[in-house]
């Protein structure tokens, strides 16, 4: 019998914990602050940014939104990043993706100082994750962090398990691989260049999918009893949302699966808020 991962409920619990931590910091005179930089007028980005802004304020944090037109220059946005780097009231900075094509996104991400790099994209923080830095005081990309918290909540043992990660983005795939390997999982990462990807998928104890292809993973691709984590979110022609997994059919074979919507998405934002508080706490130590 398949069990559905309730991302909304887990996110609610995590947000409650975060609100408690924010209140404790405020008693010490510290208000966690997050700044989001939005460039252009992409509708989805505007919605995501607004959701993050509202959630931070609801949890009692300082939330700053910096907006720029699509024709803004790299230098203008870079200057904003440097200003926020030097602002002691801001503990977390992120640049909302995607950016207009004339931007060097990696350069912007690298300009955020490691101590405020809430997305975990700075090479210094990537290196600490890759090396499994024992003090754990470094930010990790928020979606993989949320996925790991889900797996832990549902007591999914990672030690020695065959885990397949589909998609190798810096946002999900690559940090997910490192987090899992740090927990002694045997990880295979698939990309568009992988030959016979169905072979790897069918042998996975845990399948994590983040490729942006609607309902790409079918029931015949999944091992009986596998844990399936669907990171994708896609809008179909009829306006409905779906993931990268054919949920209705795959759930008949999986032992544990995330729905879309209501699975990974809520945990990503909740993890972003929790990590902002982490950065605020670490800044005072």
From Swiss-Prot:
Family per record: Belongs to the tetrahydrofolate dehydrogenase/cyclohydrolase family.
GO cellular component term of the entry, any: cytosol
Gene Ontology MF annotations: methenyltetrahydrofolate cyclohydrolase activity; methylenetetrahydrofolate dehydrogenase (NADP+) activity
InterPro entries: Aminoacid_DH-like_N_sf (IPR046346), NAD(P)-bd_dom_sf (IPR036291), THF_DH/CycHdrlase (IPR000672), THF_DH/CycHdrlase_cat_dom (IPR020630), THF_DH/CycHdrlase_CS (IPR020867), THF_DH/CycHdrlase_NAD-bd_dom (IPR020631)
Protein name: Bifunctional protein FolD
The keyword Oxidoreductase is assigned to this record: yes
SUPFAM superfamilies for the chain: Aminoacid dehydrogenase-like, N-terminal domain, NAD(P)-binding Rossmann-fold domains
Listed Pfam families: THF_DHG_CYH, THF_DHG_CYH_C
Subunit composition and interactions: Homodimer.
Catalytic activity: (6R)-5,10-methylene-5,6,7,8-tetrahydrofolate + NADP(+) = (6R)-5,10-methenyltetrahydrofolate + NADPH; (6R)-5,10-methenyltetrahydrofolate + H2O = (6R)-10-formyltetrahydrofolate + H(+)
Example GO biological process: purine nucleotide biosynthetic process
Pathway: One-carbon metabolism; tetrahydrofolate interconversion
Function: Catalyzes the oxidation of 5,10-methylenetetrahydrofolate to 5,10-methenyltetrahydrofolate and then the hydrolysis of 5,10-methenyltetrahydrofolate to 10-formyltetrahydrofolate.
The keyword Magnesium belongs to this UniProt entry's keyword annotation: no
UniProt keyword terms in alphabetical order: Amino-acid biosynthesis, Histidine biosynthesis, Hydrolase, Methionine biosynthesis, Multifunctional enzyme, NADP, One-carbon metabolism, Oxidoreductase, Purine biosynthesis
E.C. designation(s): 1.5.1.5, 3.5.4.9
Amino-acid positions noted as binding NADP(+) in the UniProt annotation, renumbered to this chain: 167-169, 233
């Amino acid at each position: 019998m398949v069990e559905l991962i309730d991302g909304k409920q887990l996110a609610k619990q995590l947000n409650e914990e975060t609100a408690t931590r924010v209140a404790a910091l405020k008693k010490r005179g510290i208000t966690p602050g997050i700044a989001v930089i939005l460039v252009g007028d992409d509708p989805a980005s505007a919605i995501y940014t607004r959701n993050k802004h509202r959630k931070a304020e609801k949890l009692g944090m300082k939330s700053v939104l910096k907006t720029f037109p699509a024709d803004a220059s790299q230098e203008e946005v870079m200057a904003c990043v440097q200003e926020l780097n030097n602002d002691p009231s801001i503990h977390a900075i992120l640049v909302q993706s995607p950016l207009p094509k004339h931007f060097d996104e990696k350069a912007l991400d690298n300009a955020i100082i490691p101590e405020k790099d809430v997305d975990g994209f700075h090479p210094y923080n990537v290196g600490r994750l890759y090396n499994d830095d024992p003090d754990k005081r470094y930010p990790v990309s928020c979606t993989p962090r949320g996925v790991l918290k889900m797996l832990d909540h549902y007591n999914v043992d990672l030690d020695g398990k065959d885990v397949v990660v589909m998609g190798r983005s810096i946002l999900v795939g690559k940090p997910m691989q490192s987090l899992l390997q740090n927990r002694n999982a045997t990880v295979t990462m698939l990309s568009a260049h992988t030959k016979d990807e169905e072979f790897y998928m069918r042998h996975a104890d845990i399948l994590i999918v983040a490729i942006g292809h609607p309902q790409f993973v079918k029931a015949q691709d999944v091992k009986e009893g596998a844990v399936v984590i669907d990171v994708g979110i896609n809008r179909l022609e009829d306006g409905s949302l779906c993931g990268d997994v054919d949920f209705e059919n795959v759930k008949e074979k999986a032992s544990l699966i995330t729905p879309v919507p209501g699975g990974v998405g809520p945990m990503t934002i909740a993890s972003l808020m929790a990590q902002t508080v982490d950065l605020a706490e670490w800044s005072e130590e």
